[in-house]
Structure formats: C-alpha cells, structure tokens
C-alpha cells in the first residue's frame, strides 16, 4: 500500500484494456486479400486438418484467419471479409473469415445455423 506522499509523486495508472483483435483497428470487420490458403493441425488433445488462410488486410496487417464450415472456394488472391473471434485449439488464429460475402461463398447444403455460414433460405 503506497503512502499519500508516494501517490502525490506518482498518480495511479489506469489499467489499459488490451484488444483481442488489434488488426481490425476497432472496426467490426475488415477486407483483405488471401496470400496463402493451407491447413494446420490443432493442439492436443484434438486432431484434424483445420483450413486457414493468410490474409493481408486493408489496415496493412498480415493475419491468419480461420475458414469455417465444410468445404470452401478460397484461394490465393481471393478477396475476403474478416471478423474477430479466435479458434481455441489453433494457437495464433484470432480471426474468422465471413462466409457468403465477397469471394467467400456460403457453405453448400447447409440447413441449420445458416446465418453463420452465409447460406440463403432454401426454397
């Protein structure tokens, strides 16, 4: 516990909140161009080949973004929309690609939870 004299000399510093998605720069989403599309393996105890893309954002950042859903058409030079949101079992992946916008098409034959994968209501 500091003394009154110490507090007069040095005021208390407010706790700065650290953003979990710095590359978005306070925006809800950012547009970017895929520079590489590849798969990586999750950390223990999970096992899979998770689809990710290296994306150069309009803010100038180069980030790794997860491609959600089954199957995708993303390739190098695809223009994608990126939102925040980490993938718990992929270290360093703090962003998601938004399906159904720009060059990322929605998930094929999706019936439930369609809004998260950019799928229109079936006729």
UniProtKB/Swiss-Prot annotation:
The keyword rRNA-binding applies. CDD domains: Ribosomal_S12. GO terms for biological process: translation. It comes from Gossypium hirsutum. GO terms for cellular component: chloroplast; ribosome; small ribosomal subunit. The keyword Plastid applies. Belongs to the universal ribosomal protein uS12 family. PROSITE patterns: RIBOSOMAL_S12. One of its GO terms (molecular function) is structural constituent of ribosome. The gene is rps12-A. Part of the 30S ribosomal subunit. Keywords: Chloroplast, Plastid, Ribonucleoprotein, Ribosomal protein, RNA-binding, rRNA-binding. This is Small ribosomal subunit protein uS12cz/uS12cy. It is found in: Plastid, Chloroplast. With S4 and S5 plays an important role in translational accuracy. Located at the interface of the 30S and 50S subunits.
